[in-house]
């Protein structure tokens, strides 16, 4: 009796075991872990790969267009010359002296036009040759060979009109040794000879940027200022090319401007974001002083970026690591100069 009572009073122990995970629970857990460990962002290629693909695409398109354009020009010049000679001979045989006189005038004008066109094509070819030289220099730097660097640099010096009396060039020649490989030869040429041209071109960019910023900040005629700044930007690109020994014609100047703009448009995303952020900060700081000063800073920074890209395209050698000029070098000078100009104008 007592045993049955004890069995009824004390119930059997119930063990609450943890439920074993089922297949559906495993799937839900896997989905939660997948959602936490992934950010669902698309895979992005490196900026260098994108820029390289774009440069190859632009180069191929330019090569196809230039071949067709050259063929048409040669055919047109040949047909013009043939028709002119035939017209002069026919006029002389028939005794039509008036037609002969006009044909001589037309032939003279055609000769002048063909000569000018040939000169433009030569300058355009020189601009393309500079791009080829930079690619060859990159190949020599990557190959790290021996025996080709000195001849290549001497060729660059000759094309850039650098004479033996040049102090940096003479020092570079005296510094060369038989143990130097091509990479070291090109780096020495960059440091001793090309650095002088880089310094002159940077001074030009700083000068034109500050002048453009001051013109926009101080003048009330916005349209006239922008036209003048556009002309000054063309002048800046031309003078930078002269510093590096490349003479530009009309079409080569247009070609260089297109290359500069394309280079700016295809710049790496990190560089663009950094520069844009600093530009907006600079314009915000300048805007606290004056709206015109902020506009001047914006135009000056645009001119500076244009000039720096022109330097990159005109250099016969690619930039060494941590050597490429930054827009921050111009930004501070612009702010200081425009702020000083604004304060002096208010005092007057």
From Swiss-Prot:
The chain crosses the membrane at residues 71-91, 97-117, 211-231. Keywords: Cell inner membrane, Cell membrane, Membrane, Transmembrane, Transmembrane helix. It is a multi-pass membrane protein. Pfam families: DUF697. It is found in: Cell inner membrane. The keyword Phosphoprotein does not apply. Its main location: membrane. GO terms for cellular component: plasma membrane. It comes from the Bacteria. Belongs to the UPF0283 family. This is UPF0283 membrane protein PBPRA2435.
């Amino acid at each position: 009796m007592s045993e049955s009572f004890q069995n009824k009073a004390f119930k059997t122990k119930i063990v609450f075991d943890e439920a074993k995970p089922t297949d559906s629970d495993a799937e839900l857990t896997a989905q939660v872990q997948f959602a936490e460990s992934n950010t669902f962002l698309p895979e992005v290629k490196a900026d260098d790969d994108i820029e390289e693909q774009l440069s190859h695409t632009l180069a191929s398109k330019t090569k196809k267009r230039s071949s067709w354009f050259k063929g048409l020009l040669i055919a047109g010049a040949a047909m013009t010359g043939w028709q002119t000679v035939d017209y002069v001979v026919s006029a002389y045989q028939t005794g039509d002296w008036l037609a002969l006189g006009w044909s001589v005038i037309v032939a003279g004008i055609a000769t002048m036009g063909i000569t000018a066109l040939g000169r433009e094509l030569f300058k355009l070819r020189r601009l393309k040759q500079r791009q080829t030289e930079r690619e060859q220099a990159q190949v020599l730097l990557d190959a790290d060979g021996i025996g080709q660097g000195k001849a290549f640099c001497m060729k660059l010096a000759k094309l850039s009109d650098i004479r033996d009396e040049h102090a940096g060039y003479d020092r570079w020649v005296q510094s060369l040794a038989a143990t130097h490989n091509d990479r070291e030869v090109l780096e020495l040429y960059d440091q001793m000879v090309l650095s002088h041209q880089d310094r002159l071109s940077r001074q030009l960019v700083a000068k034109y940027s500050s002048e453009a910023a001051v013109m926009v900040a101080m003048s009330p005629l916005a349209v006239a200022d922008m036209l003048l700044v556009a002309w000054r930007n063309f002048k800046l690109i031309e003078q930078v090319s002269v510093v590096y020994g490349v003479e530009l014609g009309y079409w080569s100047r247009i070609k260089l401007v297109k290359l500069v703009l394309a280079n700016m448009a295809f710049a790496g995303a990190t560089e663009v974001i950094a520069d844009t952020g600093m530009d907006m900060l600079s314009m915000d700081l300048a805007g606290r002083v004056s709206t015109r000063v902020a506009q001047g800073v914006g135009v000056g920074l645009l001119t500076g970026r244009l000039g720096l890209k022109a330097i990159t395209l005109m250099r016969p050698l690619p930039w060494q690591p941590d050597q490429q000029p930054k827009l921050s070098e111009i930004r501070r000078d612009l702010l200081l100069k425009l702020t000083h100009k604004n304060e002096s104008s208010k005092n007057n």
